[in-house]
């Protein structure tokens, strides 16, 4: 059995790097949504887990503690959805060659 061709290995590494850059770009475009309190608080986050929008039903604004709890729950819900979308994109790009959870951790997006 011969030694692997170093040139071919370098090409594969370069292709993998290009795929991961494509995934990074895709994650910027993905939007995940979360809500709590039956829709009284709604949030949207990017695939890179940046908060994009926050909507709070004005009817609940008198109860600050409840608003805080609902915002936290909605944000966490959206972040979980965002992480799932990111893992799905990485899995598609990797074609089973790598563990998406490891990539998310390296991108500071995993738990």
From Swiss-Prot:
Which domain of life does the UniProt lineage start with?
Answer: Bacteria
**InterPro entries registered for this protein in UniProt:** YbaB-like_sf (IPR036894), YbaB/EbfC (IPR004401)
Cytoplasm: present as a keyword of the record? yes
Q: What does this protein do?
A: Binds to DNA and alters its conformation. May be involved in regulation of gene expression, nucleoid organization and DNA protection.
Please tell me whether the keyword Cytoplasm is annotated for this protein: yes
Protein's recorded name: Nucleoid-associated protein Clim_0875
Q: Where in the cell?
A: Cytoplasm, Nucleoid
Q: Name one GO molecular function term.
A: DNA binding
Q: What keywords were assigned to this record? A: Cytoplasm, DNA-binding
Q: How does it assemble?
A: Homodimer.
To which protein family does this belong? Belongs to the YbaB/EbfC family.
What does the entry list under GO cellular component?
Answer: bacterial nucleoid; cytosol
């Amino acid at each position: 059995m011969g030694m692997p061709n170093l040139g071919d290995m370098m090409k594969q590494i370069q292709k993998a790097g290009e795929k991961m850059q494509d995934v990074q770009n895709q994650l910027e475009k993905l939007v995940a949504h979360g809500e709590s309190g039956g829709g009284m608080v709604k949030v949207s986050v990017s695939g890179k887990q940046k908060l994009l929008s926050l909507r709070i039903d004005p009817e609940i604004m008198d109860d600050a503690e409840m608003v805080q709890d609902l915002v936290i729950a909605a944000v966490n819900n959206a972040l979980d959805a965002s992480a799932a979308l990111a893992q799905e994109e990485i899995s598609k790009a990797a074609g089973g060659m790598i563990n998406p959870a490891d990539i998310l951790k390296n991108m500071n997006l995993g738990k």
